[in-house]
């Protein structure tokens, strides 16, 4: 009797599924974090934190950030369906969006002083350390991802790490899971950052037997992006510098 050979197993199928699910997971966290203040504003109750009005600049920032998250899911789906050429072409547009996000992040951060959108445990000037710290970290990870765009294992992890910078801080830390104190926020931010990277840690261990250097790089950058501004807020040493930044309080 002739034996019918089983079709070869697609070794990349599990990887494509993993990154698709990671994208969906991150988008879900962002939606939950920003639903009361942006996506479902005036529809669902707001979280117990400052919820000022949304001027055009903040709305624009939110739309660009949403577009970035949408591109993440589109890109993972393109890879999942093996449309790699389309993925690479769209990747060029994503890089332009990443560059455009940088000045928008800056403006939104410094204008937040006048909006008084900071939490109760600090003041508006010191609080700018949190969103401003994301800018060099995001820029570095995006640059490295672009430089290593031909190295798939590096590229996809660095892009994911850059996106987690948005999700762990601005997104996850908005969810009222800890007391609205400095240490409550600190614990939630650091734990949230680690939780965002945890699936990638497990995936690396499962598929490579060790943590991939790109994953380690992204995680260390993300932790530094949290620890450094938190230290500046704790000591109150950032306010004097922030007060001299262009656009503060505009």
Question: Language-model features: where?
Answer:
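Interfacial loop-to-transmembrane junctions
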Residues: 204-225
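Hydrophobic/aromatic-rich structural module bridging two neighboring secondary-structure elements via a short loop
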Residues: 78-109
